[in-house]
UniProtKB/Swiss-Prot annotation:
Record has RNA-binding as a keyword: yes
Single GO MF annotation: structural constituent of ribosome
Native source organism of the sequence: Dictyoglomus thermophilum (strain ATCC 35947 / DSM 3960 / H-6-12)
Protein name, as recorded: Small ribosomal subunit protein bS6
A GO biological process held by the record: translation
Pfam families: Ribosomal_S6
Length: 97
């Protein structure tokens, strides 16, 4: 498994409870596809440097996780289905050991 980091930007229209539910569902997707979340860093609501989908604010969450490389396309497909997830970026932190 490889070590990845995902940074998620979520809609500012979400309530605190909806925001928590959304990032927990991403956490569950990682686990259901054979991954292991190592760290979750909730940044909360922040002002954006430039508008994203006409929003000037958004909720940020950063997760570090171990994940099988062959499951990455399915994980990204699931992320794209979430309407309140404005943007995400997955970064490879370490090669397979």
């Amino acid at each position: 498994m490889r070590k990845y980091e995902i940074m998620c930007l979520m809609s500012p229209e979400l309530s605190e409870e909806e925001f928590k539910t959304l990032y927990e569902s991403i956490h569950q997707d990682i686990q259901s596809l054979g991954g292991e979340v190592q760290n979750v860093d909730v940044w909360g609501k922040r002002t954006l440097a430039y508008p994203v989908k006409k929003f000037t604010e958004g909720y940020y969450v950063v997760m570090n996780f171990l994940f099988p490389q062959n499951q990455l396309p399915e994980f990204e497909r699931r992320l794209k289905l979430r309407e309140k997830l404005l943007r995400y970026m997955i970064t490879l932190l370490e090669k397979e050991e």
